[in-house]
């Protein structure tokens, strides 16, 4: 993966490792081959372009490299170009103009500064697409606009990895229409959020809270020397209404978020990779159709309008 400057991964060349190589010895059991739906129809439009951003200033997920490689593979197979970076200086007005959508993939902490945040805000408000994967909800806490991208669904806590039962809430959205009404995930890290986003977004997936243990979690740890969690003020991970994937409009732009994607094994689950592909296609199509490049339009004086 390229970590200093954006690099194209859509051609299959360059330093981005293959998904199978990245898996290595992480999985003991065989994994079914990736089987996805037919490539989306881009209706004769120019090939869309996606920027994948995976910078971390907090916890760093072991699945990041696999996630980026998976998205690169999806782009190659489904007709969109992928550039991957961990360099925040890519976030300029002119730099982002090259893209139809941006995906924050397991980012953590504050990853952008003032002018970079402004560039992201302008990009989305003028019609660009934004997708967030898993700990994208644990990112940019001091950025009010970023909270809008999440429809207010900020990460609160998570328990240890375990099985959990997902509930499909939209049978028509391209990121969930392939899923059964209920979907048992063998092992994953399930986030709880500061509030439910229902009413502020279109909820696509939720989780059946009776199917897994919300407590103890990262903010309500057990006591004793074997405590696996850091010590935070204790809160419950129980939400009652517990969305796990959603989408909504932000200005002229579109946001899509999934709380899944912590475990490396998720990127070898056809149901999840199809879910991820559907979300990326959603924001890419929106960005290609709606995004304004008006700041490059020359004014009467011949200078770019800002």
Please describe what each predicted stretch is:
Residues 33-46:
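C-terminal region of N-terminal signal peptides and the immediate post-cleavage residues
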Residues 45-46, 156-251:
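Catalytic beta-strand/loop cores that center a nucleophilic Ser/Cys/Thr
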Residues 52, 59-140:
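Helical hinge/lid and interdomain linker segments adjacent to catalytic or ligand-binding clefts
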Residues 110-182:
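A glycine-rich, often tryptophan-bearing local segment used as a flexible ligand/cofactor-contacting loop or short
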Residues 44-48, 54, 62-65, 69, ...:
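Extracellular ligand-binding/catalytic regions of CAZymes and related secreted enzymes
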Residues 14-23, 38-39:
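Twin-arginine (Tat) signal peptide motif
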Residues 57-58, 109, 137-138, 208-212, ...:
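Short, solvent-exposed loop/turn segments at secondary-structure junctions
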Residues 1-17, 28-34:
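N-terminal secretory signal peptides
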């Amino acid at each position: 993966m390229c970590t200093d400057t954006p690099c194209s991964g859509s051609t299959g060349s360059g330093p981005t490792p293959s998904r199978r190589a990245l898996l290595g010895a992480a999985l003991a059991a065989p994994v079914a081959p990736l089987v996805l739906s037919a490539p989306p129809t881009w209706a004769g439009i120019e090939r869309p372009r996606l920027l994948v951003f995976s910078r971390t200033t907090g916890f760093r997920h072991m699945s990041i490299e696999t996630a980026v490689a998976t998205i690169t593979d999806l782009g190659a197979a489904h007709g969109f170009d992928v550039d991957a970076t961990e360099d925040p200086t890519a976030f300029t007005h002119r730099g982002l103009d090259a893209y139809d959508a941006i995906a924050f993939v397991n980012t953590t902490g504050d990853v952008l500064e003032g002018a970079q945040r402004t560039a992201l805000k302008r990009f989305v408000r003028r019609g660009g697409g934004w997708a967030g994967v898993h700990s994208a909800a644990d990112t940019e806490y001091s950025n009010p606009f970023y909270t809008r991208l999440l429809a207010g669904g900020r990460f609160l806590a998570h328990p240890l990895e375990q099985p959990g039962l997902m509930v499909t809430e939209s049978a028509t959205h391209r990121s969930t229409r392939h899923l059964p009404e209920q979907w048992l995930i063998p092992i994953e890290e399930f986030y709880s959020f500061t509030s439910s986003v229902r009413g502020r977004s279109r909820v696509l997936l939720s989780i059946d809270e009776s199917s897994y243990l919300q407590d103890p979690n990262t903010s309500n740890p057990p006591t004793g020397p074997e405590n696996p969690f850091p010590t935070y003020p204790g809160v419950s991970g129980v939400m009652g209404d517990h969305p796990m994937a959603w989408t909504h409009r932000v200005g002229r732009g579109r946001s899509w978020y999934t709380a899944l994607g912590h475990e490396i094994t998720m990127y070898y689950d056809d149901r999840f990779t199809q879910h991820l592909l559907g979300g990326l296609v959603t924001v890419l199509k929106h960005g290609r159709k709606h995004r304004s490049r008006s700041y490059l339009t020359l004014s009467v004086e011949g200078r770019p309008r800002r």
